[in-house]
Amino acid sequence: MNGVSEGTRGCSDRQPGALTQGHSCSRKMNASRCLSEEVGSLRPLTMAVLSASFVVGVLGNGLVPWVTVFRMARTVSTVCFFHLALADFMLSLSLPILVYYIVSRQWLLGEWACKLYTGFVFLTFSTSNCLLVLISVDRCISVLYPVWALNHRTEQRASWLAFGVWLLAAALCSAHLKFRTTRKWNGCMQCYLQFNLENETAQMWTQEVFGRQMAVIMAHFLLGFLGPLAIIGTCAHLIRAKLLREGWVHANRPKRLLLVLVSALSAGSHLT
């Protein structure tokens, strides 16, 4: 759900973007179908990927919270991984709704369900990204300042930080609660982002609506991808440099971990 659909007056003959990506005015649509021919041709593959992700995500991420709570000692790391697995588990649970949307080719659950579902997806996805950043910073501090970390890293502080991450993610997804709406197009109901509000003049539209659209796009890109990537990359570089100075033979492991995290962030931002 990365990217922003356009529900604007400037293109009255445009199909509003659904849960995925906005469509351009020039895209030719088949009036007898609710999705474009390009999207329709990818439906089987998309459904297979989402179904597999649902099964693996629910089983894998559902096991991690149980293990961290009942089978492991409570530490800063287990607190962070518990919340990370919980966010990913919740995101996995939402995938059947997306599969249902793809099967029906339109949004049939109403406007408030449109707002709540997209807000929920961005809440869990943003929480997962922010927790990856928190884990990376925690690892970096532990390696660079071990004495300070030993005296100040506590489970209680980790829990408060994790709670703060959830609040930050909730703030990031608030735009979907405000601007998400539904609209019929060619007889098919779509769930999309509508940036022009009621009682706005044409002059206000150009400035205000475009500003809202760009603000949401930049917030998602900077806070959902580029920002976490920069922080995680910096932490991995600092850890690797410290380990190399100390002659650790496995100093390249943080680099490989960074590649895995980058792949996860990139794949997640495009899948959603």
Swiss-Prot record:
Species in which this protein is naturally found: Homo sapiens
PROSITE patterns per the UniProt record, alphabetical: G_PROTEIN_RECEP_F1_1, G_PROTEIN_RECEP_F1_2
Cytoplasmic side: 68-78, 138-158, 235-272
PANTHER family in alphabetical order: CHEMOTACTIC RECEPTOR, G-PROTEIN COUPLED RECEPTOR 32-RELATED
Region (Disordered): 1-24
UniProt name for this protein: Putative G-protein coupled receptor GPR32P1
GO molecular-function terms, A-Z: complement receptor activity; N-formyl peptide receptor activity
Entry keyword set: Cell membrane, Disulfide bond, G-protein coupled receptor, Glycoprotein, Membrane, Receptor, Transducer, Transmembrane, Transmembrane helix
Principal location: membrane
Membrane-protein topology: Multi-pass membrane protein
